[in-house]
Amino acid sequence: IGDDFQKLYPGANILVATKKDFQKANRQQLFAKIATGNYDAVIIGHSQLGKIPVSKERQVMTIQTQIDDILQGIEELKKSEGSKFQIKAMERTRKSLQKQLDKLEKANQDDTLTFEQLGIDRLFIDEAHEFKNLFVATKLQNVAGISNSASQKALDLFLKCRYLDEKTGGKGVIFATGTPLSNSITELHTMMRYLEYDFLRDHGLQHFDNWVAVFGEQKTDYELKPAGNGFKERTRIANYTGLPELMSMFKQVADIRTADTLKLDVPDCDYQVVQVEATPFQQELVQELADRADAINAGNVDPTIDNMLKITSDGRKLGLDPRLIDPSFEDNPDTKLNRCVENVARIHAETAEDRLTQIIFCDLGVPHKAAGEAEVEGEDADDVKDKKSIAEVESLEEECDFCVYDDIRDKLIARGIPAEEIAYIHDAKTEQQKADLFDKVRSGEIRVLLGSTAKMGTGTNVQKKLIAVHDLDIPWRPADLEQRAGRIIRQGNENKQVQIFRYV
């Protein structure tokens, strides 16, 4: 990004911070440099933004506001004789926030410069959807699409946005994202809280419950059970009212551009859905999953022994290759994995003259020690903690006894593809190693790159010779599928026609 910025603005004085700059021993020097230097721009990574602290006073004020909102919600529920379960859930959230507040008030403010002291008057956030898990205080319970989980990095960004709003009159924050909504339209409220909080507050819509009461309606309907063996009732925000008014409000801060309006020079894409029939053995295992789900729903199973999360995980593994459940199972030639190998080998041979490249996306059966791996050369304890937190919370990758990546690589080599032309994104442990790897893919030296959504879904610019992407499994969020496609349907691709294979 630093190089691109300098090309666009040759006379600009920019500072590109490195991971080493953000190590604990070096931060104070970096912050002093930012505060005293005459920089036009300071470029940092998402994880580094959270290492620039916000003042203790602002943190206390924000947490106290959350507590006050929850107390108000509890009182309203009590007056309306609301569910005791809802009241207890909100009370647990209040106690958790109170603990944070007590800890914060007891902590001593060190001499580290805060975000407010650095002289920053504009904040540009690329891939802004990564901060969508902002705290939500709501009385709604068991409504699909509404998450009560909150991430620290989202809260940290919110605090910085509020400071810049105060300093610039609501003109200090710019978000850029191709996927502002990844799961539900309710995420629109989060984006509006970041970018036009004062407007929401002036109209009494800063609280989610008020906002959804105006623009959304709850609907209960039957949906397929996770195990696929029947249906169950599910409540979600399914009907929306006043959409023209809502979009008018959002467009006060949103400049929306679609691929059609931008007319970008990107290749045409042919989407191929590769449908693989389930084997009798897989069908038998699916029935076992259904039986396990029935036992869990009947309360006959200790949740530490079996639960719906385990069933969902086993179902994903079974759909890709039964060997992910048990490596001793037969390697059936007609699994998604083997069909993918056939397509990759065929395209590799057909495009050998131009040395065109391919990407295989797979979040299951990643290389051993890659899932949740935290220890990376050159990073300090905070970096390790961040990585562990991401791995534990998102669980985007799953390591199994059977390694999908190794199986694919071995079969491609057996079909004549040189081993040195195949690489894993997981082998790039540092930013420099990743940059070197991407250079080799762009040049065609490496022609098959395997990786996961988490490691390769964003920030991967290897499109120059990319002719095909293979979605071996389907990620949890629709937005992740868009991010995968964005690796190939991208400016700078020399190919006019490309393919995306999705194996089901």
Question: Model-predicted segments: where are they?
Answer:
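Conserved Helicase C-terminal RecA-like lobe
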Residues: L264-V448, A454-M456
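A short beta-strand element within the Helicase C-terminal
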Residues: E187-T190, T460-I474, Q499-R502
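Conserved segment of the helicase C-terminal RecA-like domain
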Residues: I489-V504
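Catalytic acidic motif of RecA-like/P-loop NTPases
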Residues: S47-Q48, H129-F135, P180, M456-G457, ...
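Inter-lobe coupling linker of SF2 helicases/translocases
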Residues: R27-Q72, K79-E81, F85, R92-R122, ...
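A solvent-exposed, charged loop/short amphipathic helix patch at secondary-structure junctions
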Residues: V60-K79, V136-A150, G372-E399
